[in-house]
Amino acid sequence: MGEALRGLKRTIMCGEPRENNIGEKVTVMGWVQRKRNLGGLIFVDLRDRTGIMQIVFGEEINKEAFEKSDNVKSEYCIAVTGEIVKRQSPNNDMETGAVELKGEDIKILSESETPPIYIKEGLDASENVRLKYRYLDLRRPDMQKIFMIRHKTCKVVRDFLDENGFLEMETPILTKSTPEGARDYLVPSRNYKGMFYALPQSPQIFKQLLMVSGYDKYFQITKCFRDEDLRANRQPEFTQIDMELSFVEEDDVIDLNEKLLAKVFKEVAGIDVKLPIERMPYKIAMEKYGSDKPDLRFGMEINDLTEAVKNSEFKVFKGAIEAGGSVRAIKAENCATMGRKQIDKLQDFVKTYKAKGLAWIAYKEDEIKSPIAKFLTEEEMKAILEKMDAKVGDLILIVGDKNNVVFESLGALRLHLAKELDIINKDEFRFVWITEFPLLAYNEEEGRYQAEHHPFTAIMDEDIDLLDTDPGKVRAKAYDIVLNGEELGGGSIRIHDSKLQEKMFSVLGFTKEKAWERFGFLLEAFKFGPPPHGGLAYGLDRMIMFLAGTENIKDVITFPKNQNAFCPLTEAPNVVDENQLEELGIKKIEKED
């Protein structure tokens, strides 16, 4: 049984003592990292979240403490009181390496079994074991650094927004299900049997209602929930830095958030963000990079070859152009020597993005090699090489198809090749705002338009008339902030006119009755003088990944789920008692074989 503190107070953290503390009598508390018994002396490295302190016990220092210290093992939780002295053999690899603590008294607060994982940096244990024993995983110094970064980030964000007149306000967690997009997590109601709350996918509607309420600058750091299939770096519950402002336009929201990003990245990670951040319309991003989340740390931009091959008799190119598509290409420098097997793998790669194939031209020193050369005239080949600014040693990779297939396949191929060729500067941070998103996307399966972002996004002023005549061409007052090919956050100016909002619901295929059934409370609120407003939300978890330099979202969440949305630690979700289900009016139906 562990000893009680009995009034003993910690006076200094393990990672704090320096030479200016020599001579001080202190008490430290923490976990035993390791113990070394050298006969007449016992050395213990004691760890807490600030670092490690070496403690020396000896018969000449205190015989009772010396004998007691011999009983401690790794991960025992102990308290030690003694004097800070100069270390005879300094350890320059430790921040406290110039000093050590002479152990005059020791309390063993609790013992530890042999841990199933080593408490050290750079752990190579399996993810499942780490998640099952997450409380031990979180003791590791590299994990503790991450959560100190997370804390500091939240503090910097709160301080900045407070200084800029924002109010931190909370919105409901139990709310109404308005299915449009990802699936909701549903919570059954005991009082209203057969009815359900939904956990919020975002605070979107409530923060708009706060604008109607006159709280013109709102923010919160809040949990959101989406019941979707978990891809890499997705979690069913995640944290947003959410904000909304009244009486603003796009530039106002963007300018404020550039200052916020610059402050966060500088103060938390020492990274300078060059302002103003580049802005790029969605159309340009797709045409040049094949993605609305372009990674700008390398070139390999997509070029349009449609004009150069518009008269080509090559069936793939001709068919794509006649069908209203295009022919486009990327250039892989110094890759003309790539073997046929490697190119075949690239062809298989683009086919996963529905491309029918991948044409290629290798610009070698003594020849231009290509399986499509026989289908191209000399003028067409020359035009392609000029358009691509090709030089000896370059490999040109071409896709001809519908535009969306061309963009998606070449955009993915561009990223794939950059990683394979190792041409991405991992120390660079390239921000870009993507603007002028399409407002709508047509769902061919359902035969209707769907909102690209959400149904509350405002329309660019010059495109309002297109909502009646050509909805697919309407652009939104929406903006995403992208960093190194990852979406860091996104937002928009919102519709604040009830008639326009009703019209938007109509374009999305909602009857008036259905729109009022789902969103009547918002439409009703818009009858009472709503201000122009807009906002933005960041994925805090993804932001911390960049600031902490990790590529795994589970590293930045204290108790994450695995790829199957299961918690190995608590074994949630779990079966509940029948009486709990009965109270909720729920009956389980067994699946038939």
Swiss-Prot record:
ATP binds at R226, D227, E228, Q235, E487, G539, L540, D541, R542. Residues 204-207 are annotated as: Aspartate. It is an enzyme of class 6 (ligase). L-aspartate binds at E180, R226, H453, R494. Its main location: cytoplasm. Keywords: Aminoacyl-tRNA synthetase, ATP-binding, Cytoplasm, Ligase, Nucleotide-binding, Protein biosynthesis. Coiled coil: none annotated. Its EC number is 6.1.1.12. GO terms for molecular function: aspartate-tRNA ligase activity; ATP binding; catalytic activity, acting on a protein; nucleic acid binding; transferase activity. InterPro entries: Aa-tRNA-synt_II, aa-tRNA-synth_II, aa-tRNA-synth_II/BPL/LPL, Asp-tRNA-ligase_1, Asp-tRNA-ligase_1_N, Asp/Asn-tRNA-synth_IIb, AspRS_core, GAD-like_sf. One of its GO terms (cellular component) is cytoplasm. It is found in: Cytoplasm. Catalyzes the attachment of L-aspartate to tRNA(Asp) in a two-step reaction: L-aspartate is first activated by ATP to form Asp-AMP and then transferred to the acceptor end of tRNA(Asp). Homodimer. Belongs to the class-II aminoacyl-tRNA synthetase family. Type 1 subfamily. NCBIfam families: aspS_bact, PRK00476.1. This is Aspartate--tRNA ligase. The gene is aspS.
